[in-house]
Protein backbone atom coordinates (compact mmCIF):
# COMPACT_ATOMS: atom_id res chain seq x y z
CA UNK A 1 0.00 0.00 0.00
CA UNK A 2 1.39 3.47 -0.88
CA UNK A 3 2.52 5.57 2.07
CA UNK A 4 -0.25 8.13 1.48
CA UNK A 5 -2.88 5.39 1.69
CA UNK A 6 -1.33 4.08 4.92
CA UNK A 7 -1.51 7.55 6.46
CA UNK A 8 -5.12 7.91 5.36
CA UNK A 9 -6.04 4.50 6.77
CA UNK A 10 -4.63 5.26 10.22
CA UNK A 11 -5.94 8.83 10.24
CA UNK A 12 -9.41 7.40 9.61
CA UNK A 13 -8.93 4.97 12.50
CA UNK A 14 -8.05 7.76 14.93
CA UNK A 15 -10.71 10.13 13.63
CA UNK A 16 -13.32 7.42 14.20
CA UNK A 17 -12.59 7.59 17.94
CA UNK A 18 -12.84 10.46 20.41
CA UNK A 19 -9.44 11.97 21.17
CA UNK A 20 -8.00 10.39 24.32
CA UNK A 21 -7.68 12.93 27.14
CA UNK A 22 -5.86 10.66 29.59
CA UNK A 23 -4.17 7.86 27.63
CA UNK A 24 -2.61 5.18 29.81
CA UNK A 25 0.84 3.67 29.30
CA UNK A 26 1.28 0.03 28.40
CA UNK A 27 1.80 -2.22 31.39
CA UNK A 28 4.94 -3.96 30.14
CA UNK A 29 6.64 -0.66 29.38
CA UNK A 30 6.01 0.77 32.84
CA UNK A 31 7.10 -2.34 34.71
CA UNK A 32 10.38 -2.48 32.78
CA UNK A 33 11.25 1.18 32.20
CA UNK A 34 10.51 2.12 35.81
CA UNK A 35 13.79 0.44 36.76
CA UNK A 36 15.91 2.18 34.11
CA UNK A 37 17.71 5.52 34.45
CA UNK A 38 16.02 8.20 32.36
CA UNK A 39 17.67 9.25 29.12
CA UNK A 40 16.61 9.52 25.49
CA UNK A 41 13.70 7.32 24.41
CA UNK A 42 12.13 6.52 21.06
CA UNK A 43 8.50 5.39 20.92
CA UNK A 44 7.68 3.55 17.69
CA UNK A 45 3.98 3.74 16.87
CA UNK A 46 3.01 6.07 19.70
CA UNK A 47 -0.74 5.93 19.08
CA UNK A 48 -2.69 7.92 21.67
CA UNK A 49 0.56 8.82 23.43
CA UNK A 50 0.16 7.13 26.80
CA UNK A 51 3.67 5.65 26.72
CA UNK A 52 5.38 8.85 25.57
CA UNK A 53 3.62 10.96 28.21
CA UNK A 54 4.43 8.48 30.97
CA UNK A 55 8.10 8.32 29.96
CA UNK A 56 8.34 12.11 29.84
CA UNK A 57 6.78 12.27 33.29
CA UNK A 58 9.54 9.95 34.50
CA UNK A 59 12.21 12.31 33.20
CA UNK A 60 12.86 10.81 29.77
CA UNK A 61 13.35 12.92 26.64
CA UNK A 62 11.00 11.24 24.17
CA UNK A 63 10.80 11.15 20.41
CA UNK A 64 7.37 9.68 19.63
CA UNK A 65 6.56 8.54 16.10
CA UNK A 66 3.41 7.42 14.37
CA UNK A 67 2.33 7.11 10.76
CA UNK A 68 -0.88 9.00 11.59
CA UNK A 69 -0.71 12.79 11.48
CA UNK A 70 -3.82 12.83 13.67
CA UNK A 71 -2.09 10.75 16.35
CA UNK A 72 1.04 12.91 16.51
CA UNK A 73 -0.97 16.16 16.53
CA UNK A 74 -3.10 14.90 19.39
CA UNK A 75 -0.02 13.81 21.34
CA UNK A 76 1.67 17.17 20.84
CA UNK A 77 -1.45 18.88 22.18
CA UNK A 78 -1.55 16.63 25.25
CA UNK A 79 2.16 17.10 25.93
CA UNK A 80 1.74 20.87 25.81
CA UNK A 81 -1.27 20.78 28.11
CA UNK A 82 0.71 18.77 30.66
CA UNK A 83 3.77 21.00 30.53
CA UNK A 84 5.80 18.28 28.81
CA UNK A 85 6.33 19.93 25.43
CA UNK A 86 10.05 20.25 26.15
CA UNK A 87 10.31 16.49 26.75
CA UNK A 88 8.09 15.08 24.00
CA UNK A 89 8.75 15.53 20.29
CA UNK A 90 5.91 14.00 18.27
CA UNK A 91 6.93 13.12 14.71
CA UNK A 92 4.90 11.73 11.82
CA UNK A 93 6.98 8.96 10.29
CA UNK A 94 6.38 6.08 7.88
CA UNK A 95 8.83 3.62 9.41
CA UNK A 96 8.93 1.35 6.38
CA UNK A 97 10.61 4.10 4.37
CA UNK A 98 12.36 6.33 6.93
CA UNK A 99 13.63 6.23 10.49
CA UNK A 100 14.05 9.01 13.07
CA UNK A 101 17.62 10.28 13.43
CA UNK A 102 19.51 10.12 16.70
CA UNK A 103 20.75 7.65 19.30
CA UNK A 104 18.63 6.37 22.16
CA UNK A 105 18.88 4.69 25.55
CA UNK A 106 15.46 3.08 25.22
CA UNK A 107 13.46 2.19 22.14
CA UNK A 108 9.94 0.93 22.64
CA UNK A 109 7.77 -0.92 20.12
CA UNK A 110 4.52 -1.75 21.90
CA UNK A 111 2.13 -3.84 19.81
CA UNK A 112 3.57 -2.55 16.55
CA UNK A 113 1.01 -4.52 14.54
CA UNK A 114 -1.10 -3.50 11.58
CA UNK A 115 -3.74 -5.12 9.37
CA UNK A 116 -1.80 -3.65 6.44
CA UNK A 117 1.32 -5.16 4.91
CA UNK A 118 4.39 -4.25 6.96
CA UNK A 119 7.81 -5.88 7.11
CA UNK A 120 8.78 -5.20 10.73
CA UNK A 121 12.18 -6.86 10.78
CA UNK A 122 14.05 -4.06 8.94
CA UNK A 123 12.34 -1.48 11.17
CA UNK A 124 13.38 -3.27 14.35
CA UNK A 125 16.86 -3.80 12.94
CA UNK A 126 17.18 -0.06 12.33
CA UNK A 127 15.90 0.53 15.85
CA UNK A 128 18.52 -1.75 17.37
CA UNK A 129 21.22 0.08 15.42
CA UNK A 130 19.96 3.38 16.88
CA UNK A 131 20.62 2.22 20.44
CA UNK A 132 23.48 3.66 22.42
CA UNK A 133 25.82 1.15 24.09
CA UNK A 134 23.91 -0.44 27.01
CA UNK A 135 20.66 0.90 25.56
CA UNK A 136 17.64 -1.39 25.36
CA UNK A 137 14.94 -2.10 22.83
CA UNK A 138 11.65 -3.36 24.24
CA UNK A 139 9.36 -5.15 21.80
CA UNK A 140 5.99 -6.26 23.15
CA UNK A 141 3.68 -8.15 20.80
CA UNK A 142 0.26 -9.70 21.12
CA UNK A 143 0.48 -13.40 21.92
CA UNK A 144 -3.22 -14.23 21.91
CA UNK A 145 -6.54 -13.17 20.42
CA UNK A 146 -8.67 -10.95 22.67
CA UNK A 147 -12.43 -10.55 22.17
CA UNK A 148 -11.79 -7.07 20.76
CA UNK A 149 -8.86 -8.00 18.49
CA UNK A 150 -8.93 -6.96 14.83
CA UNK A 151 -8.34 -10.54 13.71
CA UNK A 152 -10.64 -13.10 15.32
CA UNK A 153 -9.27 -16.08 13.38
CA UNK A 154 -8.69 -18.76 16.07
CA UNK A 155 -5.99 -20.37 13.92
CA UNK A 156 -3.81 -17.26 13.85
CA UNK A 157 -0.23 -17.94 14.93
CA UNK A 158 1.80 -15.37 16.84
CA UNK A 159 5.60 -15.48 16.36
CA UNK A 160 7.43 -16.20 19.59
CA UNK A 161 9.81 -13.59 21.05
CA UNK A 162 12.69 -15.87 20.08
CA UNK A 163 11.45 -15.99 16.49
CA UNK A 164 11.15 -12.20 16.41
CA UNK A 165 14.74 -11.90 17.64
CA UNK A 166 15.93 -14.35 14.99
CA UNK A 167 14.02 -12.47 12.30
CA UNK A 168 15.73 -9.21 13.27
CA UNK A 169 19.04 -11.02 12.82
CA UNK A 170 21.40 -9.04 15.03
CA UNK A 171 25.10 -9.74 15.56
CA UNK A 172 25.54 -11.35 18.99
CA UNK A 173 28.86 -9.55 19.42
CA UNK A 174 27.01 -6.22 19.54
CA UNK A 175 23.53 -7.05 20.84
CA UNK A 176 22.24 -9.55 23.38
CA UNK A 177 18.76 -10.83 24.15
CA UNK A 178 18.09 -10.04 27.80
CA UNK A 179 14.55 -11.38 27.89
CA UNK A 180 12.33 -13.38 25.58
CA UNK A 181 9.22 -14.80 27.20
CA UNK A 182 5.44 -14.89 27.39
CA UNK A 183 3.62 -13.00 30.15
CA UNK A 184 -0.10 -13.10 30.87
CA UNK A 185 -2.30 -10.35 32.25
CA UNK A 186 -5.93 -9.27 32.45
CA UNK A 187 -6.59 -6.55 29.87
CA UNK A 188 -9.51 -4.19 29.38
CA UNK A 189 -10.94 -3.70 25.90
CA UNK A 190 -12.34 -0.53 24.30
CA UNK A 191 -15.84 -1.47 25.47
CA UNK A 192 -14.75 -2.00 29.08
CA UNK A 193 -14.84 -5.80 28.93
CA UNK A 194 -11.91 -7.78 30.34
CA UNK A 195 -10.05 -10.89 29.23
CA UNK A 196 -6.79 -12.66 29.95
CA UNK A 197 -4.27 -12.01 27.20
CA UNK A 198 -0.71 -13.08 26.48
CA UNK A 199 2.12 -10.65 25.78
CA UNK A 200 5.27 -11.71 23.94
CA UNK A 201 8.09 -9.75 25.54
CA UNK A 202 11.50 -9.23 23.94
CA UNK A 203 14.28 -7.07 25.38
CA UNK A 204 17.45 -6.55 23.35
CA UNK A 205 20.43 -4.69 24.83
CA UNK A 206 23.27 -3.19 22.85
CA UNK A 207 26.55 -4.22 24.42
CA UNK A 208 29.01 -2.32 22.22
Language model regions located:
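Conserved class I S-adenosyl-L-methionine
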Residues: 1-36, 145
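Class I SAM-dependent methyltransferase SAM/SAH-binding core
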Residues: 42, 48-95
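A short acidic, Gly/Pro-enriched loop at the edge of an enzyme's catalytic core
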Residues: 99-106
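Short "lid" loop at the C-terminus of a central beta-strand within the Rossmann-like core
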Residues: 114, 142-147
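A short, conserved alpha-helix within the catalytic core of class I
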Residues: 114-127
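Conserved beta-strand signature within the Rossmann-like core of class I S-adenosyl-L-methionine
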Residues: 134-142
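Short alpha-helix
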Residues: 157-174, 179-180
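Core SAM-dependent methyltransferase catalytic element
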Residues: 188-208
